[in-house]
Amino acid sequence: MGGRRGPNRTSYCRNPLCEPGSSGGSGGGHTSSASVTSVRSRTRSSSGTGLSSPPLATQTVVPLQHCKIPELPVQASILFELQLFFCQLIALFVHYINIYKTVWWYPPSHPPSHTSLNFHLIDFNLLMVTTIVLGRRFIGSIVKEASQRGKVTLFRSILLFLTRFTVLTATGWSLCRSLIHLFRTYSFLNLLFLCYPFGMYIPFLQLNCDLRKTNLFSHVASMGPREAVSGLARSRDYLLTLRETWKQHTKQLYGPDAMPTHACCLSPSLIRSEVEFLKMDFNWRMKEVLVSAMLSAYYVAFVPVWFVKNTHYYDKRWSCELFLLVSISTSVILMQHLLPASYCDLLHKAAAHLGCWQKVDPALCSNVLQHPWTEECMWPQGVLVKHSKNVYKAVGHYNVAIPSDVSHFRFHFFFSKPLRILNILLLLEGAVIVYQLYSLMSSDKWHQTISLALILFSNYYAFFKLLRDRLVLGKAYSYSANSQRDLDHRFS
């Protein structure tokens, strides 16, 4: 019977599931090479609520067998940046059509126009600055490829130096010339609107984890009034922050070239450390996606409109719609590049090793054995543990996550299923394409028809690559799931 424990009632011993350090050690290779030794313990009789602690006398943590996914082709960084730059130029071109379109087909009695655009109204210096900002990633990839270090011939080294010098000189000269003209032509408010995103760049991409490791800000915060640093030292700290932020940004700029690795180990502390590193890396990639997408949409949709004369008419609704289309399309393309199939599989492996805990009502398991949670143990599936005055049930094959850590729960939720990110991107890109097709069929304006038709081509290519990866990986993971089910049945 349930109820409160009286003074004469026998108290069961609650031994930990495993001794500290029994699950340590790391194993390389593709699968976990050892399993955690099961520990015998007593269980109470169930209270009839459906919750029960499994018999641990014969339980063994089943070793994970990771799926071997095929090597999918990964686009080279410079080719991807060229493709992204081309898509952004198309979006910028169709927006200029929306703003500066003419009625060239009208009869001569109306104001004559021999071209489809009012080219005399376009500020080509503003167009040059916008193009350079949109092509910053492509320019950076060219400079990176031309800055390769290694054993190269004299002719190749001279060619790479000339390429790097030409690209940087042409970009710098064009940017300085256009900015000088803009400073002479427009007001300070217009220039502030033009440069506003770059002022928000450093605060958004601030190095939270790396700065805590280097104790850059904690050292300044711990100083007393008499130990205040000088202005030069503060400027050096800011320059160090700027340099480290730019270093991390350029590292994430070429995602597939700097892919982290997975250590298939059985040490709980090492697994949690690996998950923390992967969380930081994933957050950096998502920040890069968000910043690049918003920056592209801002300079494609908002900047050309801001510098238009007040007497000039344009379709404001279409400009806002173009902002959403460019931001979503750019986000999907960047996520497809920065989160390839191998990276998503890496996150899935780490989530499988981490495990997850489900919070249960203590009243429903008052007569079920509850082990005190310890961080040195790997807990098998179905075990109840007590942590921070709450009761949790193990969900994964084996679990080393901290039960009260919400970030561990989120990590396991997003990456426990390896195709979840790919499915989200596929649905998002498919929804954008369906909306564009609907807008194309219902549009009665020639400039919108041309704009939607051109933007659709870039989305078609991204959707094709996502669908190809989804079909191939779906077959691979379904075969692995059947094999894992047979292995679990053999162990049980």
Curated annotation (Swiss-Prot):
GO cellular component terms listed in the entry, alphabetical order: endoplasmic reticulum membrane; membrane
Keyword Glycoprotein: yes
Subcellular location(s) of the protein: Endoplasmic reticulum membrane
Keyword Transferase (UniProt): no
TM region positions: 77-97, 115-135, 153-175, 185-205, 288-308, 322-342, 421-441, 447-467
Low complexity: compositionally biased ranges: 31-54
Region spans: Disordered: 1-54
Glycosylation site list: 8
Main location: endoplasmic reticulum
Annotated InterPro entries: Uncharacterised_TMEM39 (IPR019397)
Membrane topology type: Multi-pass membrane protein
Keywords associated with the record: Endoplasmic reticulum, Glycoprotein, Membrane, Transmembrane, Transmembrane helix
UniProt superkingdom: Eukaryota
Family the entry assigns: Belongs to the TMEM39 family.
Its job: May protect the cells against DNA damage caused by exposure to the cold-warming stress and facilitates tissue damage repair during the recovery phase.
Protein name: Transmembrane protein 39B
Upper taxonomic lineage: Eukaryota, Metazoa, Chordata, Craniata, Vertebrata
